[in-house]
Amino acid sequence: MWTPTEEEKYGVVICSFRGSVPQGLVLEIGETVQILEKCEGWYRGVSTKKPNVKGIFPANYIHLKKAIVSNRGQYETVVPLEDSIVTEVTATLQEWASLWKQLYVKHKVDLFYKLRHVMNELIDLRRQLLSGHLTQDQVREVKRHITVRLDWGNEHLGLDLVPRKDFEVVDSDQISVSDLYKMHLSSRQSVQQSTSQVDTMRPRHGETCRMPVPHHFFLSLKSFTYNTIGEDTDVFFSLYDMREGKQISERFLVRLNKNGGPRNPEKIERMCALFTDLSSKDMKRDLYIVAHVIRIGRMLLNDSKKGPPHLHYRRPYGCAVLSILDVLQSLTEVKEEKDFVLKVYTCNNESEWSQIHENIIRKSSAKYSAPSASHGLIISLQLLRGDMEQIRRENPMIFNRGLAITRKLGFPDVIMPGDIRNDLYLTLEKGDFERGGKSVQKNIEVTMYVLYADGEILKDCISLGSGEPNRSSYHSFVLYHSNSPRWGEIIKLPIPIDRFRGSHLRFEFRHCSTKDKGEKKLFGFAFSTLMRDDGTTLSDDIHELYVYKCDENSTFNNHALYLGLPCCKEDYNGCPNIPSSLIFQRSTKESFFISTQLSSTKLTQNVDLLALLKWKAFPDRIMDVLGRLRHVSGEEIVKFLQDILDTLFVILDDNTEKYGLLVFQSLVFIINLLRDIKYFHFRPVMDTYIQKHFAGALAYKELIRCLKWYMDCSAELIRQDHIQEAMRALEYLFKFIVQSRILYSRATCGMEEEQFRSSIQELFQSIRFVLSLDSRNSETLLFTQAALLNSFPTIFDELLQMFTVQEVAEFVRGTLGSMPSTVHIGQSMDVVKLQSIARTVDSRLFSFSESRRILLPVVLHHIHLHLRQQKELLICSGILGSIFSIVKTSSLEADVMEEVEMMVESLLDVLLQTLLTIMSKSHAQEAVRGQRCPQCTAEITGEYVSCLLSLLRQMCDTHFQHLLDNFQSKDELKEFLLKIFCVFRNLMKMSVFPRDWMVMRLLTSNIIVTTVQYLSSALHKNFTETDFDFKVWNSYFSLAVLFINQPSLQLEIITSAKRKKILDKYGDMRVMMAYELFSMWQNLGEHKIHFIPGMIGPFLGVTLVPQPEVRNIMIPIFHDMMDWEQRKNGNFKQVEAELIDKLDSMVSEGKGDESYRELFSLLTQLFGPYPSLLEKVEQETWRETGISFVTSVTRLMERLLDYRDCMKGEETENKKIGCTVNLMNFYKSEINKEEMYIRYIHKLCDMHLQAENYTEAAFTLLLYCELLQWEDRPLREFLHYPSQTEWQRKEGLCRKIIHYFNKGKSWEFGIPLCRELACQYESLYDYQSLSWIRKMEASYYDNIMEQQRLEPEFFRVGFYGRKFPFFLRNKEYVCRGHDYERLEAFQQRMLSEFPQAVAMQHPNHPDDAILQCDAQYLQIYAVTPIPDYVDVLQMDRVPDRVKSFYRVNNVRKFRYDRPFHKGPKDKENEFKSLWIERTTLTLTHSLPGISRWFEVERRELVEVSPLENAIQVVENKNQELRSLISQYQHKQVHGNINLLSMCLNGVIDAAVNGGIARYQEAFFDKDYINKHPGDAEKITQLKELMQEQVHVLGVGLAVHEKFVHPEMRPLHKKLIDQFQMMRASLYHEFPGLDKLSPACSGTSTPRGNVLASHSPMSPESIKMTHRHSPMNLMGTGRHSSSSLSSHASSEAGNMVMLGDGSMGDAPEDLYHHMQLAYPNPRYQGSVTNVSVLSSSQASPSSSSLSSTHSAPSQMITSAPSSARGSPSLPDKYRHAREMMLLLPTYRDRPSSAMYPAAILENGQPPNFQRALFQQVVGACKPCSDPNLSVAEKGHYSLHFDAFHHPLGDTPPALPARTLRKSPLHPIPASPTSPQSGLDGSNSTLSGSASSGVSSLSESNFGHSSEAPPRTDTMDSMPSQAWNADEDLEPPYLPVHYSLSESAVLDSIKAQPCRSHSAPGCVIPQDPMDPPALPPKPYHPRLPALEHDEGVLLREETERPRGLHRKAPLPPGSAKEEQARMAWEHGRGEQ
C-alpha cells in the first residue's frame, strides 16, 4: 500500500531507470527526484526536470539526501539541505552541459576546451566540499575558487551574472536595491579580473586588501653540474638590487662535496630556502638572484704541490645571476614551480671578485669568462603570497623539507607585533695592508670572533648563511696576491640580547703562504665593540677599524690589553691620552673597513630614545628629550611602543602643568605614526595597551584640556600644523580619555561624573566652534576643519561607552548641524563634509533607530542641498545607499515607516531631477565623445537608479497616498508624473544595467510596474475629464509600451527552469502592465482621438510580444482606433497609413528581434480570426474598407516578414535583394506610397553596389530618375540628397547612373542617357558639360568596339513548397548568371542559399502535392535567350561585338527543349519519330534590369517535327563550318589549326559513319514522302542544306590543306579519304556533287549508293539556303558567360562513330545520336578518332542536377544553349557525351580544358590523335584537380593558353530601350545572388550538367596581329571548288557563293569588299544599311503575335534569327575595322 513518506523526500538517481513497468518514471543517472510516497521497495514521485510527470521507480536506484520540507501535503516544496554553493554548482553544470556542446558545433573550439577544463575543476572542487574533511579556511578557499570559475563560465557563455556575498548567492528580497547593485558591480569586477585560466592571483572574492601582501620566493637547488673543480664548494644565494647596488637579503648557504652532492647526506633533496617578506615595491625593483661559488681547498687549482692536508683555503671560484623579472614573466600562476639554469662564470681578475655579479649583470664580458659550457646551477623557483602563517598553512610540504628561512636585511615594510629579532649584519668590506718587505703581495685571510666582556668566545654566534648551523669563528675567503683585498661578504651575528652589552668583535689577519709548509702567519688584528658607553649600538654605517701589529707569538688571552685601545677614529677622539709603550702598536699605513646593519626589536641606536626611557636619570633634560622625540625613526618607536607610552604618562602624572602640553604633543605624534601603513599593524598593540596596560587614571583631564585649548586656538593661530595633527589623532585621544575616565570611575566609584560630562559638552562646543568658522579665506583653517571632520566619526564608539545613544546622537547632530551649507564652502570642504556624513551613516551609532530618528533629518538636509546643486553626486549616492541598506535591514521595526516618509518628502523629487540631469548628460556625452566626467558615467547612473528604486521599494500604500495628497496643485502633480515616467522610460531605453544582470533588471521591472499601478489612479483621477493633459497620458502610454517590450521580460527566449523561477517570483509582468495599459485606454473616453494615429506604432510594438494574453488584451484597441477615426473623418486612412509606416520602420530599425518570427501568426490573429478584429470590422458600417485594410496590412506583413528574415541574419545578398524588390513593388503598386518606394529604391541600389552588380544598380536608380522632370521645382532634403532643384537632382542621378552603367560595361544603356544630358546641356549652352558628356559618349563607343565582355548564362529556377519565403513560393524565375558561372556552379549556389531545399530530378511541372507540402524543392536548368532585336542581328555589316550584346541583353523570352517520341518508334532509325517539345518563357521584365532575375509571366509550349529539327541541325552545322573556315582562310603562316581539324573530322567522320545518312534514310525514303506530301518543300530544303554542307566541307579541306602541319598530314589524308566516302554516299541522291569539290577529288571511293532509290536532285535543289533565311534564323549562336564551363549547344555533338547497334530505345537515345551526327567545333578541343560506343559503356549518374556528369546541355540542335542542363536526358548518356566532346569550345576568355582519351575498339588510342596531342601540349598529364569526380580524374587536362596568342574582343552594339519617363509600375523580385563568378585561377574543371567539357580559351584562334576574320555564313554554293590560296570571304563581309569559279576568283581579286551575290534564280537585293543611330532602348516592344499551336511553328520559323557568334576581334583592331567599314560602305553606295 502506498503511504506518504516522512523522511525520504529528496534523492539523487544513482542508476538510470527506463521506466519499463506500468506508471514507471524514466530517470537518468544524476537526476534529482522529489519523493511523495513509498511501497515495498518502490518510491512514487517526480523528477525535478519534469515536475508535472509523476511515476514510480525503485527505491534502491535512489541515494537519499536530507531536505527541508515546507507546506507538507499535496503542494509541498522540498529544498535540499546542503551547502547552497554545492546546489549552485550542480545546477550550473547541468545548464552548461548543453551550451558546451553547442560551442563545438559552432566551431568555438578554444572556448570549448577551456570550458571543459573549468567544468572538470568545478566537479573536483564540489567533490572536495562534499567530502566534509576541510577546515573552515580551506572551505572558504574552495568556495572562492568555485565562485570565480562559475562567474567566468557564465560570463563567457553569455549567461546571467550571479550576485554574491561571501560566496553565497544573495536573495534580492532580503537586501536593498543599492546593496544588490553593489554586489552585481563587485561580481562583474571579479569576473573581469579573472583570466581565461581563472587566475588565482587576484585578491579574495569580495574582500579588499587594506594591507600589502608580502611575497616570498621558494628556491630549491636541484644540482650543480661541474667537472673541473674537484674540491668541496660553498654556494651562497642572495637577492641583489642592481639599481641600489646592494644586497637586500640574507645569504642562503649550500655546502657541496667535490662530486656536487650535499656535504651533509641528510640534506639530499632538502637544499631549499624561502626568501621572505618581499613587498610589492621590492617586486618592481631590478632584483637578481645572485649565486657565489666558493671552493674549499688548495690556493691554486692548477698547483701540483700538495700542501698540508689540514690546510684548506676558502677561494673564490665563480658567480651566476638570474633576473627576477624573467622569473616573474615565466611564472604564469602563483605557486607554479619552474626550473631555471644559472650559468656559472669565473672572474678574470680576482681583485674584481667583489664586483663579479655586477659585471655579469652589466654583461661586461671582458671581466669574466665561462670555464666550461657544462658549468651551471639548476634551481627551481616558486612565488608565494600571503603572511607567513598563511604560507605555512597552505604549503605544509615545503616546510617539511628542512626549509631555510632567509629574511630581508632590515625590517619588512609591515612590522608585525611580536616579531622579535636581534640580528647584526656585518659586511667585510675591504682592507689595505703593507707588503711587509716581500717581493710579492700577500694572500690575506681574515678570522673573526665574537667575544664577551670577560674574554670568552661566544659560541654559535656567527652565521655565514641560512641553511647551515651557526659557528664560533669566521674565516674569510683568500684573494691571491692582493694587499688590498675587497671581500664584500655579509655575515650575520645573532648575538643573544643579554650578551650584547659588553661584547666585541676581533678580526685577525694572516698571510697564507703557498710555500711547502703552507702555514698561515698572523701579522695584525683589529677589533670593535658592539655597544657604546651611552647604551646605543654600533650605527648602521661603514666603520674604519685601526689595524694593530702582532705576530704568531702574540697572545690574546688578556683581552683588556687591546680593549683599552681605540678601535676606530671616533674611539680615538674619546681617548686622547694613550701611552705609546703598549704591547700592540697601530699600523698607521694599514686600515680595515667593515659595515654594520642592526635589525633588532630590543636594541636601539638612537640616543634620544634612550634618554626618554631613562628620563629619571636626567630630569632636568626632560623638556629637551620630549621635544626631540619626533626626530626618532618610526621603527625605533614601534619597537619600544609600550615603554615609551608608559614613560609619557608617568611624566604627565609627575608634573601635569609643566609637561602636559609636551606629553600631549608626543602622544599625538606617536598616534599619527601608527596611521602610516608600514606601522598600521601596531594599532592592535596600541589597543591592547589601552585596554590592559594603560594606567593613567587622571590623564583624561589633561587630554581634554589640551584638546579643547587646541580647538579654541584654531581661530587665531596662523600655523596650525600641530592642531591638525591633534585632529587626526582624535580617535586614539578619545580612547585614552574614555579609558582614563573608566579607570578613574573605578578607583573613585564614579566621582566627578558631572564635571566629566560638562568637560565633554564644552569640548563639543569647541568642535562646533571650529566647524562653524568661515574657512573660505584661510586654507590653514580649512585643513584643520577637514582633519577634524575626517576623525570625528571615529569617536562615536568611544562616546557610546560613556553616554546613551540619544546623547551621542545629539552630540553628532549638533556637530553636523554646525557645518555651513554647501553654498558657503568650497568644493574640497564639500567632499570632506560628505565623507564625514558617510562615515557617520556607516557607523554603529546610525544602526540604532533611536539615533536615526535624530540624525536622519540633518543627513538628508545636507544630501538634499548637494543634489539640488548637482555637487559630489558619487559620495551622495554612497550615503543614500548606506541609508537604504540600513532601512531595509530594519524594515520590520515600526520606526521605519516614519523614516521612509521622511526620505520620500526630502529625496524623491530631487532624486528624479538628479537622474534626469545625469541621463541627459550621459546621452549628450554618447553623442559627442568628449571628455568623461565622473557624473556622466554609467556607474553614477546605476548608483542613483538603485537609490531611487530602493526608495520606491520601501514605499507602501500609505507613503504613496501621502505623496499624492501633498501636492499643492495639479501642475505640481503633472510635473512629478512627467519626471518619474521619463526616468522610468530612460531606464528601459538606456539599459543602465547590463543584459546579464537579470536579477537586477527583473527587480527594477517589478518596482516600476508596482509604482505605475499606484500612480495610474492619480493620472486617471486628475487628468481625464476637463483637465485632460495629452503630455502626461502620452508619457504614460510610452512608458507602458517600453516596459512590455523590454528584452529582459521576454520569457519565451529563456530556459524553462529560469522561466518558472521568474514566474513563481514575479509573475508575467508584461501581462500586468498590459492590463494597466488597456484599463487606462478605456478610461480615456472621447480623448482617444488624441492618440490616433500617434500611438498606433507603439501599440503595434506591444502586439509583437509573443505572449498570447498580451495580444488578447491589446487587439481591441486597434478596432477602437479605427472606429474613432471613422467617426471623426468618415474613414481611417490615417490609421492605415500610420500602421504601414510603423511596421516598415520597425523592420528597418531592426527592432523586435526574435519576436518578428511570430509576426505573421500575430497578424492572422490580429486582423484575422483570432479575437476577431476582422469579425468586428465586418459588423461595422465601414466593412468593405475595413476588410481591404486588413488584407493590405496582412500582405505587407508577409513581405516584411521575408524582409526581416533576410536582413537580420547571415542571409545571402540575393535573398535580401529579392525581398527588397518585392517590398518596393508592394509600396508602388498596392499602396502607392512614393516616399517609401523611393527609400527602397536606394536600399536596393546600395545592395547592388555592395554586390558589385553595377548594371542592376544603374537600372534601380533609373526608377527614381524617371520620376523626376527637367524642371526647377525645389525639392526638400531627402535621404542623403541636400535641398536642391528637381533639375539638379535629376542631373546628379543621370551622372551617377551613367557611371554605374560604365562600371557594369553596359555602355549601350548609358549612351541614351548621355544624349539626354547632352540635349539638356545644349539647351542651356553649358558647353563645358556638353563637351564632357560627348566625350563620355564617344568613349563608350570605343569601349563597345574594343573592350572584352562576357556573355552570361541564363537559368530557370522553380521554387516549390510552402517553406520558401512568400515572394518565392511556388513561382519560377529566370536568373542571369554571374560571369564564369555555369549550371553546376549556379545550382550549388542555389542549394547553399537554401540548404533545406531538395533538387528535383526531372523537368516536369510539379503536382499540387509538392506545391502545398511543408518543404522546399528547387527545379533548375539552363535556358536560351531569344533576343528581341533580330534586325540588328540580321545586318551583315554590324560587328559581331555589337551583335553579341543584343543576343543576351534586353531579353524577355527564353526557351528550353525536351525530346520525345510521337507515334511508333522505328528501331532502325529513330530520327523518324523524334520530336522536340519547345517551351518558351516570357518574363515580367527584360534582363538585365533592377534585379538579376525576374519572375516568369507566361509559358508557351510548341512541338517541333523530326524533319524541321533535322533542317535546323544541318543548317546550324553549316553555319558553324562557314564561320570557322573563314577564320582560317586568311592565315598566311602555318598556325595551330586544331579547331578546324577537329570540326572537319567531326562532321566528315560522323557523316561517313551514320550522320546525315540517317536523315536520308528517315526523310528521303519514298514511304515517308508518300505519307507526308506536305513536307516536300522541307525535304527539298534539307537536301539543299546537305549539298551545301558537302561544298563547305570541300572548302574547309582546301584551307586545311594549306595550313596543315607536316606531322598532321596523315590526319589530313584520312579526312580527304573519308570526305570522298561521304560524297560517294550522297552521289546517287545528288549527281552534281562530284563537281563540287575538285580539290578533294582524286581519291574518291564511293562507299555505296545510299540514295540510289531517290529521284535525282532537281535544278532548284542546288540553290543554297541563304544564311538569313527564316530557317537559318531560328537559332543563334552566342558566346558563353563562363570560361570555366562549356555549354554544349544543340548543334554540338561528339566525334564518335556510332555502331549500328548503338542506338537506344528511349527518345533521348535518338536525340543524343542526332547531336553526335553533327559535332560542333565550338564544344570540342581535340581531333579524335572514331570511337564506337555501345550502350554498355554508359555510366549513369545519380543526379541530373547535382552530378558532375549531368545531362547534355542542349535538347535540340537549333538553339545554342536552349536546354543546358535540362534534366530530361537520362544519366546513361553523360559519360558517352563527355567522351565525345573532347576539347573545349571556343570562348572569348581564357580557361582550361578537359580531354578524355578516345579509345578504339582494340583499346589503343589513334595515332593521329596522339600526334595532335603532342602538337598541342606535348605529353598529356592526368588532371589532379581535387574538385573533379572519380570519372573525371582519368581525363587529360590540356592548356592551350600557353601556346596561343589572345584575340580581341567582340564589339557590342547599342541598346534598344528608351529613356522616356515611365509611370510607377511593379517590378518583380529577384532572388539572384550577387556573388562574383568562379575563380578563374582553376585551370581544370569537371564536366557538368551544362556540357560535360570545359571551354577553350580565346587563344585557340591564332595571332592577334592578324586582321579579324568575318564569321558570317556563305550565301550560295559555288559550282567549282576554291583554291586553297583564295579567300573564302573578304574581311568584314559575309562569304558569297557564285555558280562559277571564275566569278569567285574575279570577285576576290577585284575588290577587297564586295556586296552580296545572289544564288542562281534569285534576284539580288540591296544590302540593308546599318541605322544611323542605334535603336533606342526602353521603347515599348510590339506585342507577341498570337498563334494557334499548329500555326505557331511555321510563323516562328519565318521569324528572322540572329547569327551564330563569331571569333572576336583582336585588341587594337577596332580602329582598322572602323576605317574598313567606312570604306566598304562607300563602295556599296557606288
UniProtKB/Swiss-Prot annotation:
Matching InterPro entries: ARM-type_fold, C2_Dock-B, C2_DOCK-type_domain, C2_domain_sf, DHR2_DOCK3, DOCK, DOCK3_SH3, DOCK_C_lobe_A
Residues found modified as Phosphoserine: 1658
GO terms for molecular function, please? GTPase activator activity; guanyl-nucleotide exchange factor activity; SH3 domain binding; small GTPase binding
Q: What spans are recorded as compositionally biased (Polar residues)?
A: 1755-1765
Every copy of the C2 DOCK-type domain together lies at 421-599
Motif SH3-binding, per the record, lies over: 1970-1976
Biased composition, class Pro residues, residue ranges = 1967-1977
* Outcome of swapping residue 1296 to R: In NEDIDHA; uncertain significance
* Domain of life of the source: Eukaryota
Instruction: Please state the pathology the record ties to this protein.
Output: A chromosomal aberration involving DOCK3 has been found in a family with early-onset behavioral/developmental disorder with features of attention deficit-hyperactivity disorder and intellectual disability. Inversion inv(3)(p14:q21). The inversion disrupts DOCK3 and SLC9A9.
Q: Subunit info?
A: Interacts with presenilin proteins PSEN1 and PSEN2. Interacts with CRK.
UniProt protein name: Dedicator of cytokinesis protein 3
